[in-house]
Amino acid sequence: MDHSRRTLPGVSAPADGPDPDPAPDPDPDPFAGWARRLYRPLEALHIVGYFAEETTQAYLGIGLTDYGMGYFASRSAAMGPVRPEVTTATFYVFSAPLVAAVLPRAWGLASPEDIVDARLRGIEAALRRGLGDAADSAEVAEAAELAGQALVGLETAGRPLAAAHLGLPVPSTPLLALWHAITVLREYRGDGHLAALVLAGLDPVESLVTAVAGGGPAKFLKSTRGWSPEQWAAGQTRLRNRGLLDDDNSFTDAGQAVRGTVEHRTDAAAAAPWRRLGEPGCARLLELARPLSRTIAASGILPARLAGPDPS
């Protein structure tokens, strides 16, 4: 197995890289604020599956050939045996040839149902390694209950990845029920983020370029999303021509404003489940999630660049 591919996704919502902290919104929705505050500690629990050996081994065990296939197939499997064009569209920032290298071939090696099951087995093993005794704690059970409440009656029109994952059965154990709810919530946020990128007129490459301009990891994003240096440079040129980047490919004031608007719209579009949970529930879930995410970070299961402390 090629372990160098194990850093392929690094997919934290937004999918184009770490989200920059935007300037304060002049009239913030409090639940948009909760969406932002809850995102990072919950994301630390979700993304364990993208980096843990346990999930990779689970995919290899059902016949998938490598880490990259496991990533694209496992995140797509909730939608069924979709064509690569569907995954490319819903994941947004990965090049079409990169996705087409593993889909639909993966569906001939394992069914989407078997891939979903393998993902859960790998996730459970990884979370148990990362959390230790906390995996079976009352805090995990309470967090699962709260995160699940945020999903009750959730409208997913226009949110294909969130809808697909919401349609999966809720696992019976609190640990996996928590991961399932977090996954629906992060895909819900991600679907809204992609809409914000489209509304801002940022195509997949331009989305990545602006993520780098906002402080995202340039080497990592350039090497894992499947775009050529020429395609990347062309994206930079388009953004300079729009006045969003300067000659050093850093943000102009206009570029910073556009990216800040994307982040504000992402938070606003992610607010609905947290509004359902209510402020006391949001505050309690944040109180529960932060120690769990710090335990995961301290376990060494995540790459160092993703294991920093979550913001207050």
Where are these regions (language model features)?
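Accessory, usually C-terminal, subdomains that scaffold auxiliary metal cofactors
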Residues: 225-303, 310
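Phosphate/adenylate-binding glycine loop and adjacent helical scaffold
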Residues: 2-233, 304-312
